[in-house]
Amino acid sequence: DGSNYGLTVEDLDNGFNFAVSSSHGTFSDLIRDILEAEGPMPARWLAKRAGQELGLERVSEPRLRQLIRKIPLSLSIDPRDGSVFPPGEKYDKFRKAYRVRRGTQRWYNSVSLAETINAIVTVTRSLRGATRDEIQRVVASKFFGYSRRGSKIQKLLDEAMDCGIEDGRLNAMGDYIRPARS
């Protein structure tokens, strides 16, 4: 809970100065700890995680906006989807993708666009090229834990694949996708 940082929900309501250190750390420390433990994530998801660490079961929309405004601007933020990256990581250089354990799932909206692109590139390389559908099926299964692709996950996978092509990390030949030569 947020007690590890000496912060409480009451601190938020009483105008807590997020930049001032408490006896155990600051809100910035909390944000950095979450990012270092879980990797980059969209700002909305990061704010929800911070709220949970402060003891909130649900994070209301006004509270969510309040927490998003307090995310340190010194962290790298991907302009494409607003994902926030751990200290020392830059969104345009980030090359990690985290697989899920069998039988578990990740919320599609908790994963940064950059990580989804990396997962697609990783799968494309391992398959030495494949159709969009084949690549996306493997990514949905291995990196998100989904056996089916609903419209929202499909939209995310399409956007990530298109970004991978635009970034020059993938080559498209019709519906067939190949890894770019590095």
Which functions belong to the PLM regions below?
Residues 1-182:
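C-terminal non-catalytic scaffold/interaction domains in large multidomain proteins
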